[in-house]
Amino acid sequence: MVRMNVLADALKSINNAEKRGKRQVLIRPCSKVIVRFLTVMMKHGYIGEFEIIDDHRAGKIVVNLTGRLNKCGVISPRFDVQLKDLEKWQNNLLPSRQFGFIVLTTSAGIMDHEEARRKHTGGKILGFFF
């Protein structure tokens, strides 16, 4: 089976493991985008530590779950988001104003929408979590 969207598979498996109440989840294959997305989630405390296992193939990631995550998902296609349009996406994707994050890929790297607003940069929308 050919994987069309590696990030979507990773977030779906995290979502399913979280719903089942698991403590850990194994994600494969590993990619830079997944690692950066997980780093943003970890920075906000939605997941615990994660470990990258290099098996000289595509690699694996073991993610420790904390039980704080309600939902995470990918936005496909990756729409361009200007800074002024970010508010609309926030209203569409997130349940409330002070809750959850949208992850963007910008010229300054992969970051959440609040950091993008602070750095005054737009980009393409990758996904969300809350």
Swiss-Prot record:
The keyword Ribonucleoprotein applies. SUPFAM superfamilies: Ribosomal protein S8. Coiled coil: none annotated. One of its GO terms (molecular function) is structural constituent of ribosome. It is linked to Diamond-Blackfan anemia 20: A form of Diamond-Blackfan anemia, a congenital non-regenerative hypoplastic anemia that usually presents early in infancy. Diamond-Blackfan anemia is characterized by a moderate to severe macrocytic anemia, erythroblastopenia, and an increased risk of malignancy. 30 to 40% of Diamond-Blackfan anemia patients present with short stature and congenital anomalies, the most frequent being craniofacial (Pierre-Robin syndrome and cleft palate), thumb and urogenital anomalies. DBA20 inheritance is autosomal dominant. NCBIfam families: PRK04034.1. Component of the small ribosomal subunit. Part of the small subunit (SSU) processome, first precursor of the small eukaryotic ribosomal subunit. During the assembly of the SSU processome in the nucleolus, many ribosome biogenesis factors, an RNA chaperone and ribosomal proteins associate with the nascent pre-rRNA and work in concert to generate RNA folding, modifications, rearrangements and cleavage as well as targeted degradation of pre-ribosomal RNA by the RNA exosome. Required for proper erythropoiesis. This is Small ribosomal subunit protein uS8. It comes from Homo sapiens (Human). The lineage of its organism: Eukaryota, Metazoa, Chordata, Craniata, Vertebrata. The gene is RPS15A.
